[in-house]
Amino acid sequence: MLGTANLPSRNKYKAKATILHMNRNLYLVAYDICNPRRLRQVCRYLTGYKVSGQKSVFEIWVTPTELHTIRTELDKLMDTQADRLHILSLDPRMKPRCYGNASTFTVQHFCIV
């Protein structure tokens, strides 16, 4: 990793700016959280990592270390008996199929979040 820096955030979860390097993978994160307070916390946390998304489904482009951190933090925020979370690895070699208003996004080789 080339470098990270803490950024100010409106919530208690600090967003991290990371200079993109080649060891990132694309994941789809979908969640169903029963409690409104936990729902807001999970949504705010994932917003710091998303490249796109809508409501309770986000696409995130992260390193294996960041993915481990995300899993650990979400495990703390969720009630594992009542809430559901899916993290699906998306194969970057597959061509995306878009329908309706959907459009593909491109990831730059250098990106500051």
From Swiss-Prot:
Keywords: Antiviral defense, Endonuclease, Hydrolase, Magnesium, Metal-binding, Nuclease. SUPFAM superfamilies: TTP0101/SSO1404-like. It is an enzyme of class 3 (hydrolase). Its cofactor is Mg(2+). One of its GO terms (biological process) is maintenance of CRISPR repeat elements. One of its GO terms (molecular function) is RNA endonuclease activity. The keyword Hydrolase applies. Mg(2+) binds at D32. Its EC number is 3.1.-.-. Pfam families: CRISPR_Cas2. Belongs to the CRISPR-associated endoribonuclease Cas2 protein family. CRISPR (clustered regularly interspaced short palindromic repeat), is an adaptive immune system that provides protection against mobile genetic elements (viruses, transposable elements and conjugative plasmids). CRISPR clusters contain sequences complementary to antecedent mobile elements and target invading nucleic acids. CRISPR clusters are transcribed and processed into CRISPR RNA (crRNA). Functions as a ssRNA-specific endoribonuclease. Involved in the integration of spacer DNA into the CRISPR cassette. Homodimer, forms a heterotetramer with a Cas1 homodimer. This is CRISPR-associated endoribonuclease Cas2 2. The lineage of its organism: Bacteria, Pseudomonadati, Pseudomonadota, Betaproteobacteria, Nitrosomonadales.
